[in-house]
Amino acid sequence: MPSELAMNNDELHVVMFPFLAFGHISPFVQLSNKLFSHGVHVTFLSAASNIPRIRSTLNLNPAINVISLKFPNGITNTAELPPHLAGNLIHALDLTQDQVKSLLLELKPHYVFFDFAQHWLPKLASEVGIKSVHFSVYSAISDAYITVPSRFADVEGRNITFEDLKKPPPGYPQNSNISLKAFEAMDFMFLFTRFGEKNLTGYERVLQSLGECSFIVFKTCKEIEGPYLDYIETQFRKPVLLSGPLVPEPSTDVLEEKWSKWLDGFPAKSVILCSFGSETFLSDYQIKELASGLELTGLPFILVLNFPSNLSAKAELERALPKGYLERVKNRGVVHSGWFQQQLVLKHSSVGCYVCHGGFSSVIEAMVNECQLVLLPFKGDQFFNSKLIANDLKAGVEVNRSDEDGFFHKEDILEALKTVMLEDNKEQGKQIRENHMQWSKFLSNKEIQNKFITDLVAQLKSMA
């Protein structure tokens, strides 16, 4: 049931309504916690099956009300769907419009924060006198490159191609040398495919969301993505507000003894952690090359690999890993599948490098913990986040890949790791480490991070 908490006249009330993938839910939860700590009343909307996990990450605070939406087909998150059926989830979201409208009428919040898929929400919110805020879970560099009106400026009515996407849109920040490889551009072509009863593309949904909302909020800051934020503001001609990078609060959990004992056996900053999250599944060739590259370094490592829930992780690992691999690395390497205390492992003094997919939250987490970054992106905004860190900020290194198919070899993994772990006295490695340290200090400064939220709350109050 909706919240019955009494509202003070000067208390800001926001409703959070993310897309149903946990990669989207998590930033909304992080922002909810930050806003609540600054006196903002928060109500969270999601599917029933997601609520236990959401509650567990909302600082265990019962004052943040979580409301269950009903979904007619029972599909409630991307973990339950293969990628080619993700459109079904968006369609299911479209069918919640009447529920959402009734809740907004009852709750009467000042704002509703929403995600890319709910292109219909700005109009719906306006009809009931509520302002809508598009909260982008993606980096500004990504949105500025892909989902801006000028993306179609040179297309002239024809269908967009991956060759178009290899180049930045007209007006893209001139000081940026960002472009996409062929395999990266191909990954974004799904955004221009029509699906669902409304026959809209993902690009059209995002553009409508950004174009019709009251204003836009990004989980970044000018220091990191200034030129891209300015470009987006120019493209959509509306305020772009910032929450800051939403640096996660330190975990109150304790690292499991099996991990702490293993890590304690190695020197400071010598261990490589390699992990790609719960919804990224590597192919056999990718596993073989990645595992072999880690082996070639001669350094201790933890390799976390996950697989679809309908497969046996043990069987998949036995098939995909190089023959005799576990025996060869048994004294310095661990291959793990399943739940993993990533934040606590990154914090351990023995961990010195994080090989990840370039998800923005993962990158921030690594930089706060002073772990060197090796970036191996697989989809979407991960490609841009990796380029931002490696090219713009020069605070990490991206694994070299072939242009056409994204293929990488064990030697590419080795070279990237050598740059930040074994050749830190050479110019490139030295520069990366120095830049990384500066960004780590910036992100770890609680006064700076607190000011981002203080300023955002002040702006929200002034615009309510």
Swiss-Prot record:
Q: List the PROSITE patterns.
A: UDPGT
List positions binding UDP-beta-L-rhamnose. Answer: S278, H357, S362, E365
UniProtKB keywords:
Glycosyltransferase, Transferase
Pfam families annotated for this entry? Answer: UDPGT
Q: Where is the active site?
A: H24 (proton acceptor), D115 (charge relay)
User: What is the catalytic activity of this protein?
Assistant: a flavonol 3-O-beta-D-glucoside + UDP-beta-L-rhamnose = a flavonol 3-O-[alpha-L-rhamnosyl-(1->6)-beta-D-glucoside] + UDP + H(+)
EC number(s) recorded for this UniProt protein: 2.4.1.159
- Highest taxon of the source? Eukaryota
Name any one GO molecular function: UDP-glucosyltransferase activity
The record's tissue-specificity note reads: Expressed in young leaves, flowers, pods and pod shells. Barely detected in seeds, roots and root nodules.
The residues listed in the UniProt record as binding an anthocyanidin, with positions renumbered to this chain, are H24, G380
| Protein function | Flavonol 3-O-glucoside (1->6) rhamnosyltransferase converting kaempferol 3-O-glucoside to kaempferol 3-O-rutinoside and utilizing 3-O-glucosylated/galactosylated flavonols and UDP-rhamnose as substrates. Prefers kaempferol to quercetin as an aglycon, and 3-O-galactosides to 3-O-glucosides as a glycosylation pattern.
Q: Which family does it belong to?
A: Belongs to the UDP-glycosyltransferase family.
Q: What else is known?
A: Flavonol glycosides (FGs) having rhamnose at the 6''-position of glucose or galactose that is bound to the 3-position of kaempferol are present in cv. Koganejiro, whereas FGs of cv. Kitakomachi are devoid of rhamnose.
Under which name does UniProt file this protein? Answer: UDP-glycosyltransferase 79A6
Organism of this sequence:
Glycine max (Soybean)
Gene from which this protein is expressed: FG2
